[in-house]
Amino acid sequence: MDIRPLEEHLGISFQQKALLKEAFTHSSYVNEHRKQRLSDNERLEFLGDAVLELAVSQYLYRNNKDMPEGEMTKLRAAIVCEPSLKNFAEELEFGKFLRLGKGEQQTGGRERPAILADAFEAFLGALYLDQGFDNVLDFLNIHVFPKLTTGAFSHAMDYKSQLQEFVQQHKDQKIEYRIIEEKGPSHNKEFVAEVVIQEKAAGIGTGRTKKEAEQRAAKNALDSINNS
């Protein structure tokens, strides 16, 4: 396996080339090439899983100083879950660099979510061993962490549902969301939303979409409630 195209694609040069090869080697390939005494990526995936969890935990702790532990746990789980890891790997085109057995390749292994997710974690494990934790953080700062500011994981932080649950504890209260302002050109709008409970403004938030603005308004309301 010539890993130079992979290194060029990633913009990263490995000192220990064998680690990068191993990160992209599936067990099905090893099983079909037993005489070569190759290693699959499962051990690196195990390591990468731990490295990713620590990196995400550190990022959330440092960049969300007012976020409670429970919310950080939910958000971290959304970032490190298989569907998210699969998406990261797809965006980086990891599938085309995988070493798969013929059977796995013929049955769509290059697009299989579990294989892509494992390869992403294995790559992080290899990067950690080759270049250290700081370089893993640099990689995630480019390819993963910016997604947190674009609402990619907003499904994990459904503040509207949390606020609705609170309001339902007081049966007579009515909750309503209003878009009170739209700013910017049509191709780059910013919306300002207000959440109203019992005809009283309870929170305000901004976002690139109406839904994002409403979620942030709900979070603002919840923060006010929790701090009162």
Curated annotation (Swiss-Prot):
Is the keyword Cytoplasm assigned to this protein? yes
Name the domain of life this protein comes from: Bacteria
Q: Which residues bind Mg(2+)?
A: E45, D118, E121
Q: Which GO terms describe its molecular function?
A: double-stranded RNA binding; metal ion binding; ribonuclease III activity; rRNA binding
Query: Domain DRBM: where?
Result: 158-227
Name the cofactor(s). Answer: Mg(2+)
Top-rank EC class of the record's enzyme: hydrolase
Query: Where does this protein have coiled-coil stretches?
Result: none
Q: Which reaction does it catalyse?
A: Endonucleolytic cleavage to 5'-phosphomonoester
Q: Where is the RNase III domain?
A: 3-132
Example GO BP: rRNA processing
CC per GO annotation: cytoplasm
Q: What EC number(s) is this enzyme filed under?
A: 3.1.26.3
Q: Where in the cell is it found?
A: Cytoplasm
Active site (record annotation): D49, E121
Residues annotated as region Disordered? 205-228
Q: How does it assemble?
A: Homodimer.
The UniProt function text for this chain reads: Digests double-stranded RNA. Involved in the processing of primary rRNA transcript to yield the immediate precursors to the large and small rRNAs (23S and 16S). Processes some mRNAs, and tRNAs when they are encoded in the rRNA operon. Processes pre-crRNA and tracrRNA of type II CRISPR loci if present in the organism.
Question: What is the protein name given in its UniProt record?
Answer: Ribonuclease 3
For this protein's source organism, the top of the classification is:
Bacteria, Bacillati, Bacillota, Bacilli, Bacillales
Question: Its gene?
Answer: rnc
